[in-house]
Amino acid sequence: LSIRVLLHKLLILLQVTLSVVVGKTMMILFPDTTKRYILKLGEKSRMNQNPKFSYENWGPTFFSFQYLLFVLKVKWRRLEDEAHEGRPAPNTPVVALNGEMQHLFSFMRDNRPLILNFGSCTUPSFMLKFDEFNKLVKDFSSIADFLIIYIEEAHAVDGWAFRNNVVIKNHRSLEDRKTAAQFLQQKNPLCPVVLDTMENLSSSKYAALPERLYILQAGNVIYKGGVGPWNYHPQEIRAVLEKLK
């Protein structure tokens, strides 16, 4: 690693640690104010509307040590981002559920847009909006192709865990990731599902953790969605595809 990257990582570590210390202190001294702040964040990801979770299932986990580790991983991973609108898309390797190694560009057909949906079953926002994504596949399959890339877990039971969530551990092997992806089959995805490599190459190059949406066309990134859960919006994909009809 270069000195510049190491310094950047150190700065991120200090920023995240400071925010966790301040957040934890606020939770102790001003619990009601902090709860309102966290609920306000939850509105952006529709977490407050998720019938599966009450605030007590997820809110108190903020500013924990596992929270710190996950946020740190996400922010460090973003330093590897190589996917930018109007620029060539990273042709990263992915693994089919039958074990075959493929690359993202192999799912492109002619000049048709390819929508990439990165996520995992322990990410409540990804699962809550999955039917909305499936509707996109149904409505636009005549003009576009779709691909789900199953990445590392957002809220693994042995990581930053939420109560009342699906119980999946962090993936130690590709077989673990494949087993986790089987849970997604219960949602009847209308497009192919592939696995990120255990080196998390797609997740890294697309800065996709914990969830993210992209549109590729002719080898370039034409739409880069915001980082989930707060800025993961399938309806933005609909707006772009409507213009391409």
Curated annotation (Swiss-Prot):
Instruction: Identify the Gene3D superfamilies for this entry.
Output: Glutaredoxin (3.40.30.10)
What is the active site of this protein?
A: U123
What protein is this chain from?
A: Type I iodothyronine deiodinase
Instruction: List locations, semicolon-separated.
Output: Cell membrane; Endoplasmic reticulum membrane; Basolateral cell membrane
Membrane topology, as annotated, equals: Single-pass type III membrane protein
User: What GO cellular component entries does it have?
Assistant: basolateral plasma membrane; endoplasmic reticulum membrane
The residues on the Cytoplasmic side of the membrane are 31-245
Question: Which top EC class applies here?
Answer: oxidoreductase
Which family is it part of? Belongs to the iodothyronine deiodinase family.
Q: Name one GO molecular function term.
A: thyroxine 5'-deiodinase activity
Origin, by domain of life?
Answer: Eukaryota
Q: Which residues lie on this side of the membrane: Extracellular?
A: 1-9
Catalysed conversion reaction: 3,3',5-triiodo-L-thyronine + iodide + A + H(+) = L-thyroxine + AH2; 3,3',5'-triiodo-L-thyronine + iodide + A + H(+) = L-thyroxine + AH2; 3,3'-diiodo-L-thyronine + iodide + A + H(+) = 3,3',5'-triiodo-L-thyronine + AH2; 3,3'-diiodo-L-thyronine + iodide + A + H(+) = 3,3',5-triiodo-L-thyronine + AH2
Q: Which UniProt keywords apply?
A: Cell membrane, Endoplasmic reticulum, Membrane, Oxidoreductase, Selenocysteine, Thyroid hormones biosynthesis, Transmembrane, Transmembrane helix
The residues that cross the membrane are 10-30
| Main subcellular localisation | membrane
